[in-house]
Regions:
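Short, acidic loop-to-helix structural element flanking the phosphoryl-transfer center
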Residues: 11-12, 16, 20-61, 71, ...
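Short acidic-hydrophobic, aromatic-tinged amphipathic segments that line or gate anion-handling sites
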Residues: 88, 164-172
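Glycine-rich phosphate-binding loop signature in dinucleotide/nucleotide-binding domains
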Residues: 55-57, 109-116, 180-184
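Acidic, Mg2+-coordinating phosphoryl-transfer loop and its flanking beta/alpha structural elements
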Residues: 119-165
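Short, acidic/turn-prone active-site loops that include or flank metal/cofactor-
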Residues: 87-94, 141-147
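Conserved Lys-Pro-Asp/Glu-containing loop-to-beta segment of HAD-superfamily phosphomonoesterases
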Residues: 97-131
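Helix-loop "lid/cap" segments that line or gate small-molecule binding pockets
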Residues: 1-13
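Substrate-recognition/cap helix-loop segment adjacent to the acidic, metal-dependent catalytic center
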Residues: 36, 46, 50-60, 64-91, ...
């Protein structure tokens, strides 16, 4: 069983209040039809998740954003059900939630070896934690504004963090799925 910890939310440096104002405005535009799901996600991300589901992968979502907000956004965008492994987010107490803790819990609860864990993320923390347990780490070095294309600064950071594969988006879904499931 290959499990995946997948990050759809991109790292954005705003205060929580500013971030939630922006999210609320965008959710209002989504509900009114001014925006569509693809305006919120990286190119090919949702198709990639469904391709993994077809392979029987249990998928988790972990974010540094408050858990209730992550769940609300996933439900509003219509992809919450994809995350059958659970949706994790900040609970306001670092002793009760961290990406490291989420990875450890997933491994323990599913009796996994690290090599059965695939982490896809845009931050050095999740990449480093994945590599510490010998997991497979894919770094997303994306241009967050366009939601596709390569960000060289992120690429360098992710490589230094231990990412084994770097992608800029999920536009090559089938090739990435084939690579992940190639027997070594």
């Amino acid at each position: 069983l290959l499990d995946i910890l997948f990050y759809l939310r991109q790292s954005i440096t705003y205060t929580d209040k500013d971030l939630m104002k922006m999210v609320d405005k965008r959710m209002t535009k989504l509900k009114s039809g001014q925006l569509i799901v693809q305006d919120f996600t990286m190119k090919g991300a949702v198709d990639f998740l469904y391709a993994l589901k077809e392979k029987g992968v249990r998928i988790y979502l972990a974010s540094g954003t408050d858990k209730a907000d992550v769940i609300n956004e996933a439900e509003s965008l219509g992809y919450a059900a994809i995350f059958d492994g659970g949706i994790y987010g900040s609970v306001g107490d670092i002793s009760k939630y961290s990406k490291k803790m989420v990875l450890e819990d997933i491994i323990r609860e599913n009796n996994l070896k690290g090599s059965e864990m695939l982490v896809i993320g845009d931050g050095p923390v999740e990449i480093k934690e994945c590599r510490k347990v010998n997991g497979i780490a894919i770094g997303i070095a994306s241009d967050e504004v366009r939601r596709y294309g390569l960000n060289q600064e992120k690429r360098s950071r992710l490589i230094k963090s231990g990412a084994q594969i770097i992608i800029s988006d999920f536009s090559q879904t089938q090739e990435l799925v084939d690579l992940i499931f190639t027997k070594r």
